[in-house]
Amino acid sequence: MATLLATPIFSPLASSPARNRLSCSKIRFGSKNGKILNSDGAQKLNLSKFRKPDGQRFLQMGSSKEMNFERKLSVQAMDGAGTGNTSTISRNVIAISHLLVSLGIILAADYFLKQAFVAASIKFPSALFGMFCIFSVLMIFDSVVPAAANGLMNFFEPAFLFIQRWLPLFYVPSLVVLPLSVRDIPAASGVKICYIVAGGWLASLCVAGYTAIAVRKMVKTEMTEAEPMAKPSPFSTLELWSWSGIFVVSFVGALFYPNSLGTSARTSLPFLLSSTVLGYIVGSGLPSSIKKVFHPIICCALSAVLAALAFGYASGSGLDPVLGNYLTKVASDPGAGDILMGFLGSVILSFAFSMFKQRKLVKRHAAEIFTSVIVSTVFSLYSTALVGRLVGLEPSLTVSILPRCITVALALSIVSLFEGTNSSLTAAVVVVTGLIGANFVQVVLDKLRLRDPIARGIATASSAHGLGTAALSAKEPEALPFCAIAYALTGIFGSLLCSVPAVRQSLLAVVG
């Protein structure tokens, strides 16, 4: 199409033999000495007047109809290009609208469920209840009207892929404000927490992996191919430059007009959010060898902290106030971290779609999956409580790190069931556990001789939740379905377990 538009109507290409035959077909019946003759042999046209040296021949079109025909072709090509551009724009608008509507419904459902549970004084994760409701609806539709279940899955697929694409970002705020969270924790307690986190991750990995192997040997279920899981699209250069522009403009604006949006937290929100997103985009594009020691989440958190440090220095306010504006925990005056963590509920709701997609896999390997997840979750909670007591860690800190192997969204819900906990420490410990798993899980699994994809997937997700899952599945896609299921079920079962008052009391008794 572009070539058509770029080629002139009268061009040297018209002098080709094929083109000459086409142009003169109406008038040539014979030739003699360069003359074109009619059927009766009379001279019609002398071509010698139009002859040019080789390489410079230029044969004028002999018919105005042919000229009009080629002009029409060019106009049609231009019309086609315009139509193509319009259709592309229309598709993009429809896709964006689809994403906004589907994601908006999930966020709205999460918000109203939270409000309802708070109003009813229900101490149970509202997002988990919503996840069960969505999964139940999908299962009912699948048994009665399968087309309706597929239609529902297709409708929410853009929102699901959006959540998967940006999932690590929702974990970052706890790392960004870590300097404020650990300020009151003694250094000796910090060392003990690090020991529990690192050793606990390794122990949970072993328990989940070897449990899965033992159950697989008993049930002897053959592994079959799972449903393919869609992968989010990579980041584009346009996204990088767009967020860079937002950062520069909002940073300068906040520097000269610190309360232009009403409060300092709102004014700081655009540049702190864009710096976080930029760090993640840049970190995701790093070579795999660098990602092993410099995970995208670390790059993301470091980018936000450096932006806060630069703004604190330039404005003279210092680092702490800017970090305080990053995560305010005030609904009426949110910061960038509050916006990101506001998606955590939608992460839990999205578990319903991933579980439904892999329902056949869950049914086939139910024994391995559920046994490993239950044993690993119970071990993780009670071993953390016991080791915390043995090393002399403060009870409030021990309780805060109990759900170290459970995804942030549900870990925060779990610690909210206990009194006197540090939720910022909880989130930070969960993220650090995931980072340890992301960096070392493949090497450790190989050392432990856990070769089975099911065991590797379950062990990774049960010990290092989403971050470990992403790291392993990037190189071992066959383990991804088992990672996704174990990742969701570990959080679900841990939340259900800690929602039982007797279990909470037993954990507190172990903690001392």
UniProtKB/Swiss-Prot annotation:
Top-rank taxon, per record: Eukaryota
Cellular component annotations (GO), alphabetically ordered: chloroplast; chloroplast envelope; chloroplast inner membrane
Tissue specificity of this protein: Expressed in leaves, stems and flowers, but not in roots.
Localization per Swiss-Prot or TrEMBL: Plastid, Chloroplast membrane
InterPro entries attached to this UniProt entry: CidB/LrgB (IPR007300)
Gene name per UniProt: PLGG1
GO BP term (any one): cellular response to water deprivation
Job of this protein: Glycolate/glycerate transporter required for photorespiration.
One matching Pfam family: LrgB
Keywords from the UniProt entry: Acetylation, Chloroplast, Membrane, Photorespiration, Plastid, Transit peptide, Transmembrane, Transmembrane helix, Transport
Membrane-topology descriptor: Multi-pass membrane protein
Protein name per the record: Plastidal glycolate/glycerate translocator 1, chloroplastic
Primary localization class, coarse: plastid
One function term, GO molecular function aspect: glycolate transmembrane transporter activity
Stretch forming the transit peptide: 1-76
Membrane-crossing segments per the record: 93-113, 127-147, 160-180, 195-215, 238-258, 270-290, 293-313, 336-356, 367-387, 398-418, 425-445, 480-500
Sequence positions bearing N-acetylalanine: 77
Family classification: Belongs to the CidB/LrgB family.
Disruption phenotype: Interveinal chlorotic and premature necrotic leaves. Bleached leaf phenotype when grown under ambient air, but normal growth under CO(2)-enriched air.
